[in-house]
């Protein structure tokens, strides 16, 4: 019995190490979000750190600040959804599809 419990604990520790490594890798993975037919593009990590915002120059000459703000927000939301999807897929690979209670993705 003791050997079985020790083996389970060892496997749990290995899983925890793999999860931590995957989280560290995801912090470097970049995803994009787009809005307005790609007139606005947001690049962020799977940790939700925004790295870049690209705005097509044509949006800057038109003077519609509210529309531009809406497009930036939509592009950020698109990037967040993509980051969450990529994170969930990567973590699922590590856990073999098990849903581990209390594990909030991405971090």
Swiss-Prot record:
This is Nucleoid-associated protein AFE_1920. Binds to DNA and alters its conformation. May be involved in regulation of gene expression, nucleoid organization and DNA protection. Keywords: Cytoplasm, DNA-binding. GO terms for cellular component: bacterial nucleoid; cytosol. Belongs to the YbaB/EbfC family. Gene3D superfamilies: Nucleoid-associated protein YbaB-like domain. Transmembrane segments: none annotated. Its main location: cytoplasm. Homodimer. PANTHER family: NUCLEOID-ASSOCIATED PROTEIN YBAB. It comes from Acidithiobacillus ferrooxidans (strain ATCC 23270 / DSM 14882 / CIP 104768 / NCIMB 8455) (Ferrobacillus ferrooxidans (strain ATCC 23270)). It is found in: Cytoplasm, Nucleoid. HAMAP family: DNA_YbaB_EbfC. The keyword DNA-binding applies. Pfam families: YbaB_DNA_bd (PF02575).
């Amino acid at each position: 019995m003791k050997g079985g419990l020790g083996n389970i604990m060892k496997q749990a520790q290995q899983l925890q190490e793999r999860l931590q490594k995957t989280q560290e890798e995801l912090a470097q993975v970049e995803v994009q979000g787009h809005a307005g037919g790609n007139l606005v593009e947001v690049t962020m990590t799977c940790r939700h750190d925004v790295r870049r915002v690209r705005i097509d120059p044509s949006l800057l000459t038109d003077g519609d600040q509210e529309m531009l703000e809406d497009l930036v927000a939509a592009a950020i939301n698109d990037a967040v959804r993509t980051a969450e999807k990529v994170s969930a897929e990567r973590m699922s690979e590590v856990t073999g599809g098990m849903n581990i209670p209390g594990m909030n993705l991405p971090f």
